[in-house]
Amino acid sequence: MCSRVLVIVRGGGDLASGVVYRLARAGFPVLVIELERPLAIRRAVAFASAVFEGYVTVEGVTARRIAHTGEIAEARAVGEVPVLVDPDGASIGALQPPVVVDARLAKRNLGTSRLDAPLVIGLGPGFVAGEDCHAVIETNRGHYLGRVIWRGMAEPDTGRPGSVQGRALDRVLRAPCAGTVAPLAAIGDAVRVGGVVAMVGGEAVYAPFDGVLRGLIHPSVPVRAGLKIGDVDPRGVREHCFTISDKALAIGGGVLEAILSAPQLVPAPGAGARPADRPG
């Protein structure tokens, strides 16, 4: 069943990449569609990086940028995940996949509809299962992370990053002004409090505490003042910068469960509760 079910994933950031990784490892053909200049921060573990670099490998799964949908089969033939610049999602209508996953984490619906595919899955707040999609995956850290919601919504956006060793808002690096980012440190580098991590439009971006630079937006991406451009991890474990997070894998597991249990994809009379009857 898996090899016959094309899944289009909108977005290739680090959380979306946890989804792509889970699906690819389970044998599903996946197409990632992205912006011309993706806003991914944790680029070392984001399949969106293929847009900039041509290729990226995350924990043994390689993604390749393709120019058009006609190159999907070529990428799949060598075990690679195709990544297509398709900000408007035109490939969804052209390919008519059985599954669409909106993994852009925009905290609002950017136009995804239940009519996009037989199974449409939204990640996090901004979607209503049963209205604009078939299932929602909880993305908020805590007891319900990764849970499949068949009716209703995920927990609301708190506007606050998850706490890591007591650090929350201050672990996020933001652009002090509009411009492009000139990095002075690389992802995985150790940083010290007050050290300059990058420059934006001639203004310095400082490390808020000792740790490692877990993510930094690509230098070709124009940024506005206040935009999230980086992430410092106080745990200081370099390996974490290059491996998929527990959160991303939990969300990916939720998407995998939703696909495998959706009756519109796998009719199984008497196999258990229908999705609409499952607890949210």
Residue ranges, per PLM feature:
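Well-ordered secondary-structure scaffolds
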Residues: 2-280
